[in-house]
């Protein structure tokens, strides 16, 4: 009887560990994927973005500035929102909403549309997401290992960023013709595929 109880206890411990690992991996993937559309696309593919969107670097900076303003405001109600609603529901809604923004982004909306979509990303990635991510990570870490939890989260996000950027660069290069100067249509198709990739990851 004692042996059976020990085996059952050990099995429960393994199952609990597996669940914790899966949950943290999900947090890492979500925690980086949600910021891919507002940040990765312009960070790693800026020249193509400017040409395809038909905007200048200054106009792109203005759109990202709108993101910053909306995000700064969104931090304040984001905390109480995370305390009121389950973190998993907020994270899921944020990811889906950001993906919808990605579909609009893939239409290359120009300057005004860029202002709107980056402002929208400020709501979906901060108001709905950031505080919920922090809360879920804190709960995962418990009372004594919160620092370790945040370290694993940020380290994993860095790795996730590198993997996604590499795949995005490969997709872009595969879509552009070899040996000839790519046309604007070629660049549009290539960048759209990259945006769809990031949208799918979100």
Outline where the language-model segments fall.
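Pair of pore-lining "gating" transmembrane helices in MFS-fold secondary transporters
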Residues: 18-43
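Central cavity-lining transmembrane alpha-helices of secondary-active solute carriers
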Residues: 65-79
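C-terminal ends and interior cores of transmembrane alpha-helices
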Residues: 96-110
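Hydrophobic core of transmembrane alpha-helices in multi-pass small-molecule transporters
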Residues: 113-128
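Intracellular juxtamembrane helix-capping segments at the cytosolic ends
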Residues: 128-142
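Glycine-rich segments within core transmembrane alpha-helices of 12-TM secondary carriers
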Residues: 150-173
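Symmetry-related core transmembrane helices of the 12-TM Major Facilitator Superfamily/SLC fold
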Residues: 192-202
């Amino acid at each position: 009887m004692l042996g059976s109880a020990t085996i059952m206890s050990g099995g429960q411990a393994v199952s609990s560990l597996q669940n914790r690992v899966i949950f943290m991996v999900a947090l890492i993937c979500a925690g980086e994927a949600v910021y891919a559309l507002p940040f990765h696309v312009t960070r790693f593919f800026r020249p193509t973005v400017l040409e395809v969107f038909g905007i200048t670097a200054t106009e792109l900076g203005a759109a990202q500035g709108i993101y910053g303003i909306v995000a700064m405001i969104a931090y304040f109600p984001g905390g109480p929102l995370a305390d009121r609603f389950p973190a998993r529901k907020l994270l899921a809604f944020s990811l889906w909403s950001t993906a919808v923004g990605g579909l609009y982004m893939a239409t290359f909306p120009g300057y005004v549309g860029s202002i709107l979509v980056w402002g929208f990303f400020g709501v979906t990635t901060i108001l709905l997401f950031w505080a919920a991510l922090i809360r879920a990570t804190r709960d995962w870490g418990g009372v004594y290992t919160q620092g370790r939890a945040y370290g694993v989260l940020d380290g994993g996000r860095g790795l996730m960023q590198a993997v996604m950027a590499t795949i995005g660069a490969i997709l872009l290069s595969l879509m552009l013709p070899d040996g000839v100067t790519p046309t604007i249509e070629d660049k549009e198709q290539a960048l759209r595929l990259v945006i769809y990739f990031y949208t799918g990851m979100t």
